[in-house]
A protein has these predicted regions:
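Extracellular/periplasmic carbohydrate-active domains that bind, remodel
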Residues: 1-187
């Protein structure tokens, strides 16, 4: 835990058969996975806010573009810590074929632009927890996906979706565990 990673530019990447996440930011080692296991009740992880110091991990100012991934456990996984979100990231021009698509936790000011998601598990395709200032522009998913976007947590705010056909999914959005629909702007 700790250290700064910032001002990184990555482009023109082809990946195949990635056993974990194709694109991953951050680690919060002490968090309970917010995905409920069989028989468990889904709830937000209990977190202990720590003061920001030299041990606080910092991930910010990334630009990743022109990525093709054929096979991964998860396409994009972003997980910050409550006291220091992963922030200021642009992810664009991607085709990601994976079991799960996008999982964002404790993140701020993230732009997802022109991304095609082909995922085996579609409930949800995009999962957002305790994050703010996210923009989803030109996101494409498979017709008949179960749930396009799931938003969780009372700190999930200022989410924008534009140029995206939400009707591809059986259910467009869900708001859980304190997330509210008024924080979503669909254009």
């Amino acid at each position: 835990r700790g250290g700064e990673v910032e001002n990184i530019f990555i482009k023109d990447i082809d990946m195949k058969d990635i056993p974990a996440e194709a694109i991953m930011f951050g680690r919060y080692y002490m968090a309970k996975d917010p995905v409920a296991l069989s028989g468990e009740k889904r709830e937000l992880p209990k977190v202990e806010l720590k003061p920001v110091d030299e041990t606080t991990p910092v991930f910010r100012n990334f630009h990743i573009s022109n990525v093709y991934c054929s096979g991964a456990e998860k396409g994009i996984f972003i997980r910050g810590v409550p006291e220091m979100h992963v922030k200021d990231i642009v992810l664009e021009n991607m085709v990601l074929q994976s079991r799960k698509s996008i999982d964002v936790q404790e993140a701020s000011n993230i732009t997802f632009r022109n991304i095609t998601l082909v995922s085996a598990e579609t409930n949800p395709v995009v999962d957002v927890t305790q994050s703010d200032g996210l923009s989803f522009d030109k996101i494409k998913i498979s017709e008949g996906s179960a749930l396009f976007f799931r938003f969780s947590g009372g700190k999930t705010r200022n989410i924008q979706i534009k140029n995206t056909d939400l009707n591809k999914a059986k259910q467009k959005t869900s708001f859980e565990l304190g997330a509210v629909e008024k924080e979503l702007n669909v254009q």
